[in-house]
Amino acid sequence: MDRVMKLASERAVVIFTLSSCCMCHTVTRLFCDLGVNALVHELDQDPRGKEMERALLKLLGRGPPVPVVFIGGKLVGGTNKIMSLHLGGELIPMLKNAGALWL
């Protein structure tokens, strides 16, 4: 859990993914298209990835454990939450408040 929280605070937006996950790619692409330089951490490329995956599952309280997005060091959620925030017009203000967007 400590490693997840440490990584989550390294940048304004941190996304935990799996390289083979299509929804992870979709969420990562959304942030890229918005102009956000997110830190993408692929759990299947990390020797401690399984341990972090379990920690993320514990934080979320449900599965699937990826993608998981942190904004401003705070857990926001997975695909459904990010898409809901985006469609509701709440994601961009959240990104601006975290310093991930300047426009």
UniProtKB/Swiss-Prot annotation:
Bridged cysteine pairs (disulfide): C21-C24
Motif, Responsive for interaction with TGA factors: chain positions: 100-103
Family annotation (SUPFAM superfamilies): Thioredoxin-like (SSF52833)
Alphabetized UniProt keyword annotations: Cytoplasm, Disulfide bond, Electron transport, Nucleus, Redox-active center, Transport
InterPro entries per UniProt: GlrX-like_pln_2 (IPR011905), Glutaredoxin (IPR002109), Thioredoxin-like_sf (IPR036249)
Gene Ontology CC entries for this record: cytoplasm; nucleus
Chief place where the protein resides: cytoplasm
Cell location: Cytoplasm; Nucleus
Entry keyword annotation includes Disulfide bond: yes
UniProt superkingdom: Eukaryota
Domain Glutaredoxin: 1-102
Purpose: Has a glutathione-disulfide oxidoreductase activity in the presence of NADPH and glutathione reductase. Reduces low molecular weight disulfides and proteins.
Membership in a protein family: Belongs to the glutaredoxin family. CC-type subfamily.
Protein name: Putative glutaredoxin-C14
Gene from which the chain derives: GRXC14
